[in-house]
Amino acid sequence: MRVYPTFFRLAFSWMDAERAHRIGFRAIRLAHSSGAGRVLAKFTAPAPSLQTTAFGITFPSPFGLAAGFDKEGHGIEALTELGFGHVEVGTITGQAQPGNEKPRLFRLVEDKAVINRMGFNNDGATAVAPRLKSARAALQRRHPGVRPVIGVNIGKSKVVELEDAASDYLVSARSLAPAADYLVVNVSSPNTPGLRLLQNVETLRPLLKAVGEEADKAAGRHVPLLVKIAPDLTDEDIDDVAKLALDLGLDGIIATNTTIGREGLTSDPEKIRDCGPGGLSGAPLKARSLEVLRRLKEATGGSLTLVSVGGVENARDVQERLDAGATLVQGYTAFLYEGPFWAARINRQLAKHPARR
């Protein structure tokens, strides 16, 4: 019998979602700082058979934590102790910013979903960079072989105009690339005004080219570069982004971010309206995310690393994404509903799957 669903219902379901997130994340970090996390890691570490190589890096497991949970790099080590093969930090912007007004995070428990309009609240690239450097060094010390991987997701500062977006992304790339195992350009969040316009290939091409060059220069090595796209793109737009990624020699595409759609929800319509605008994540995104993955697989012919995220709840979902062409799979929303042993449970079940790769 699993205890966490009952604990969630009693302790967290009545609480403001953002406050519950803060408390839960603090508990995870406390387990690490007390030493309990290291003991826990002996039981949650992915089986060696799960090791996966993507863009020249070996990951302990194909399953990792998507951007959004640890926005500022405060708990990277602690989260890897729960079994995640990689942790994607962010979204981080060139300038520190408070994000949108609260409340800005809402649960739709009946749908196992979340609506957020956080707005990239973070300390800014300059403040986050030392945390990434420290976490990377610590993971290298603790894992002399294959270690958990640190991804860094960067976005546009809200106060920066769209025409100046490239220079803002370059600030982040310059500061963060040296401590990043891979870098993600986020142009698909619905919560920064105008950001999704950057998904237009004519705008996206020079942005990605500039970020890639700046990241490699700052790090003194090639930093794998990926772009994260929205599920709301048309098939034609998806094909265009795939072609652009191939033309530029990008290392991969992450699909998908949250959706602005509200189709197929079972939660009370009035409750959904009360949540207001924002990106929807969780189980309702499952079908569309898989659809986009398959489209990208066909469009790229397997030439790029595809990272699938959106509606991933269990090992079956992870396996389905791997079978559909993903090299890596990420989750986040189900972590809030399933509890701290979610990643370890998925890894155990994946390791039992004889045809995983």
Curated annotation (Swiss-Prot):
Keyword terms: Cell membrane, Flavoprotein, FMN, Membrane, Oxidoreductase, Pyrimidine biosynthesis
Function: Catalyzes the conversion of dihydroorotate to orotate with quinone as electron acceptor.
Swiss-Prot/TrEMBL catalytic activity: (S)-dihydroorotate + a quinone = orotate + a quinol
Pathway membership, UniProt: Pyrimidine metabolism; UMP biosynthesis via de novo pathway; orotate from (S)-dihydroorotate (quinone route): step 1/1
Residues bound to substrate: K71, N116, R117, M118, G119, F120, N186, N191, N257, T258
Protein name: Dihydroorotate dehydrogenase (quinone)
Family to which this protein belongs: Belongs to the dihydroorotate dehydrogenase family. Type 2 subfamily.
Active site (record annotation): S189 (nucleophile)
Matches recorded under CDD domains: DHOD_2_like (cd04738)
Main location: membrane
Record-listed FMN binding positions: A67, G68, F69, D70, K71, T91, N153, N186, K228, T256, G282, G311, Y332, T333
Gene Ontology cellular-component terms listed: cytoplasm; plasma membrane
PANTHER family: DIHYDROOROTATE DEHYDROGENASE (QUINONE), MITOCHONDRIAL (PTHR48109:SF4), DIHYDROOROTATE DEHYDROGENASE (QUINONE), MITOCHONDRIAL-RELATED (PTHR48109)
Membrane topology: Peripheral membrane protein
Pfam name, any one: DHO_dh
Source organism: Arthrobacter sp. (strain FB24)
Protein location: Cell membrane
Subunit: Monomer.
Cofactor annotation remark: Binds 1 FMN per subunit.
Enzyme Commission identifier(s): 1.3.5.2
Cofactor(s) listed in the protein's UniProt record: FMN
